[in-house]
Amino acid sequence: MEYMINRVNHKNYGWLVDMGNFLCADEDPQHAVGIAAPYAVHAHVKDFIFKKGTEDMPAGRWITTRGGNYIRGTVVGHGVVPVRPCMNILKRAGYNGYVSVEFEGAEDTLAALNQALEYLRRVDA
């Protein structure tokens, strides 16, 4: 991605930093956001529950990661994504744009979004 963004080299071309998606590839979100942050044009925040691939696959809507682990969406702040550190990395890189909440969990959607908003307000304080 860095290579492509640098090759395009246009102010209108950058990185949609989706901090939760890095887990789908078994990448450390904090490290990956650190790489992506200087190129951020928008940010998504979501959270996942994580299970090692050495365990039995849980029942329900789980995603198998590239490395064979299991993740399932949950309320922002309830999972393993280091949201506060990722947000701080984005801020330090100069990102001051919008952050969209993505929710892919099994919990009630409206309740989950309200909890995510409450959590993000505390993180941003």
Where are these regions (language model features)?
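Histidine-acidic metal/acid-base catalytic patches
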Residues: 1-125
